[in-house]
Amino acid sequence: MNIMLFCSVFILVSLTGLSVSDDVPGNYPMSLYGNKYSCGVLGENEYCRKICKSHGVNYGYCFNSRCWCEYLEDKDVDFWAAHKNHCKNGKLYPPKK
């Protein structure tokens, strides 16, 4: 009886762990030429962090040999769109009236 109860509780706890996802939304940023940025050092590295900062987010890393940026929205995936959305230079991008 105790073994059956233990197994039931163990299975329930295991299933609840599967239903809770820790996946962080993000995207692969695109370069000027419409390509994903390649990276050689998997995991956290300075190159991908710089790429992600240029696209308007603070954190990124090398995943599947491409830079992955956490919380990168669809509107900022393209380099020029991200530049326009985050550039503070009023001469390049005058404020809309």
UniProtKB/Swiss-Prot annotation:
KW Glycoprotein (keyword) present: no
PROSITE patterns: LCN_CSAB
GO cellular component: extracellular region
InterPro entries referenced in this protein's UniProt entry, alphabetically: LCN-type_CS_alpha_beta_dom, Scorpion_toxin-like_sf, Scorpion_toxinL/defensin
Signal peptide: 1-21
Known tissue expression: Expressed by the venom gland.
Keyword entries, A-Z: Disulfide bond, G-protein coupled receptor impairing toxin, Ion channel impairing toxin, Neurotoxin, Potassium channel impairing toxin, Secreted, Signal, Toxin, Voltage-gated potassium channel impairing toxin, Voltage-gated sodium channel impairing toxin
Function: The heterodimer non-edited LVP1 induces lipolysis in rat adipocytes. Induction of lipolysis by LVP1 appears to be mediated through the beta-2 adrenergic receptor pathway (ADRB2).
Family: Belongs to the long (3 C-C) scorpion toxin superfamily.
Name of this chain's protein: Lipolysis-activating peptide 1-alpha chain
Organism: Lychas mucronatus
